[in-house]
């Protein structure tokens, strides 16, 4: 055998033993295609404003194509259901909101597993949830609502931005402790619920969407469902202060399907962290009465796991579990 033929034969033999994956073209650097962020609520609420702030920052500062799409309904579970089934390449992401991940799965069947089907990328904001009424309402405080409900069973109508969400469950737990009967009216988003309230169709709304309406003097806060008071409204009590069994705020962030590539996670962690220092984002937080709260992917995942179990236990203890 000639030397040239021998070398050629060895090269072919070695090549035959190399896995085909080594010859595959390298994956393009993230992001290689446009990104869509799915919002679990209708347009116009606090979640919408925060999502558009994230998308605008990424477009303007990172020069990438980012779209925002809305998937309201079904207890805010449509968006996470679609994200869970999406290709894990970072082109489909979602706005994280507490309810569809931490409460709804304990109360109804959903097509995803909160602890297994997602990559929690970064949290960026919290907004105290509140029960609020029109500014001209007869109810000046939370005690007024309880007295009215006690004397008029079922006549106090209230709604939230999503059925069986954390706001819904927290208020139901408080009302149960007070032994009063009210009428819950479901809506697909905070903006829709507020429109119904201002139109006189319901008496109150519980959501994180009150900021612009509060600033305009259209609504009055009666009680916060969390642990922290609002500095500008020190007389508004919290559920924690009143000793109610569930006290929680709304946390928002970015998530994607399970098994997202590390570079996609790092990319959006960076975008989120940078955005939180921008004047534009601070203005949005002021509009929605929110505050900054950065959680990296690892810390965000731990937060979800801890609160999923805690809220599940609380829901079961309250006898609210229907699944």
Sequence positions of predicted segments:
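A ligand-binding cleft/hinge motif common to bilobed small-molecule-binding domains
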Residues: 99-109, 175-177, 204-234, 312
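Hinge/capping helix and adjacent helix->loop/strand transition within the periplasmic-binding protein
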Residues: 85-91, 106-188, 192, 239, ...
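N-terminal (or domain-start) structured segment
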Residues: 27-117, 155, 163, 167, ...
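Short, cationic motifs built from Arg/Lys/His that form the positively charged side of catalytic pockets
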Residues: 3-4, 52, 70-71, 122, ...
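An extracytoplasmic/periplasmic, membrane-proximal ligand-sensing/linker region
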Residues: 32-34, 176-182, 262-323
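N-terminal twin-arginine translocation
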Residues: 1-5, 10, 14-30
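Short beta-strand->loop
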Residues: 113-123, 181-185, 211-212, 216-247, ...
């Amino acid at each position: 055998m000639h030397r040239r033929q021998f070398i050629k034969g060895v090269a072919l033999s070695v090549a035959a033993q190399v896995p085909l994956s080594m010859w595959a073209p390298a994956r393009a650097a993230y992001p290689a295609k446009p990104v869509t962020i799915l919002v679990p609520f209708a347009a116009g609420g606090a979640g919408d404003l925060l999502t558009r702030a994230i998308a605008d920052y990424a477009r303007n500062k990172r020069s990438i194509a980012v779209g925002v799409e809305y998937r309201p309904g079904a207890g805010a579970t449509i968006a996470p259901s679609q994200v869970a089934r999406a290709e894990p390449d970072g082109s489909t992401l979602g706005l994280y909101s507490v309810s569809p991940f931490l409460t709804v799965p304990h109360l109804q069947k959903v097509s995803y597993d909160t602890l297994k089907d997602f990559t929690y990328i970064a949290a960026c904001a919290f907004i105290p949830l509140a029960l609020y009424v029109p500014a001209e309402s007869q109810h000046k405080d939370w005690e007024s609502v309880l007295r009215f409900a006690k004397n008029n069973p079922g006549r106090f109508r209230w709604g939230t931005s999503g059925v069986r969400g954390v706001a819904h469950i927290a208020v139901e737990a408080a009302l149960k402790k007070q032994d009063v009967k009210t009428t819950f009216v479901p809506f697909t988003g905070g903006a829709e619920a507020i429109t119904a309230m201002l139109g006189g169709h319901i008496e109150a709304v519980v959501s994180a969407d009150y900021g612009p309406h509060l600033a305009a003097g259209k609504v009055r806060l009666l009680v916060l469902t969390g642990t922290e008071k609002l500095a500008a409204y020190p007389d508004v009590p919290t559920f924690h202060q009143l000793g109610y069994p569930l006290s929680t705020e709304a946390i928002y962030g970015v998530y994607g399907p399970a098994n997202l590539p590390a570079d996609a996670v790092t990319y959006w962690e960076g975008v989120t962290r940078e955005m939180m220092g921008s004047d534009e984002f601070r203005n949005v937080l002021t509009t929605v009465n929110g505050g900054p709260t950065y959680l990296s992917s690892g810390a965000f995942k731990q937060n979800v796991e801890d609160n999923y179990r805690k809220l599940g236990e609380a829901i079961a203890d309250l006898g609210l579990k229907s699944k």
